[in-house]
Amino acid sequence: PGLSVGPAEPTMGLRGGHVFEVSFDGCLVPEENRLGEEGAGFRTAMKVLDNGRIEVTATCTGIARAALAAAVSWAGQREIDGAPIARFQGLQWMLADMAVDLDASRLLGLRAAQLRAQGQRFSAEAARAKLHASEMAGRVTDKALQIHGGYGYSRHMPLERYARDARIMRIYEGSSEIQRNIIARNLLA
């Protein structure tokens, strides 16, 4: 009885952190160690998730920023017929779309963080920021891989890690579907 921690779960991405199963069996917590008021656990957990969604937005922005920088660098270095692939208009449009997506996510995250810092309600804004940023990170890493061609699929390139790490962002701190529910609930309230 009590607290038990299982073995580390191997994960596809985010290998800098570890995932463990934690079990509480007959575990008694003294009242002075309780977080929040009795019966308010769900509300407390939701506030933690709202804060976490801003952090996920920042993480997604960082992943996408690194992927975009890699794509821009590669487009300037990689040559076809003696000229960089950056000369192709289609590739330029991909880079432009990636940059716009990245800026939109950054600004949505800043708005949610600003509301939090001002002590205002920010649940819907955090959900919007997290939804956009997590899906944006997937789009941007995918386009960066496309720009790199076959080299982008290599495990020797950092894009492999960015793509793996971007994928979990649409799941934790509430999946994209949950974010849509939160946003819609706030719109319809």
Residue ranges and their predicted role:
Residues 1-73, 80-83, 175-189:
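FAD-binding core of flavoproteins
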Residues 14, 120, 127-189:
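Alpha-helix capping/hinge segments and adjacent helical runs
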Residues 45, 71, 112, 163-166:
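Short alpha-helical scaffolding segments that buttress acidic/His motifs in well-ordered protein cores
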Residues 62, 96, 103, 131-138:
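Generic structural signal for well-ordered, non-transmembrane alpha-helical segments
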Residues 72-86, 99-132, 145-153:
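C-terminal helix-coil-helix/basic helical segment that borders enzyme active sites and/or dimer interfaces
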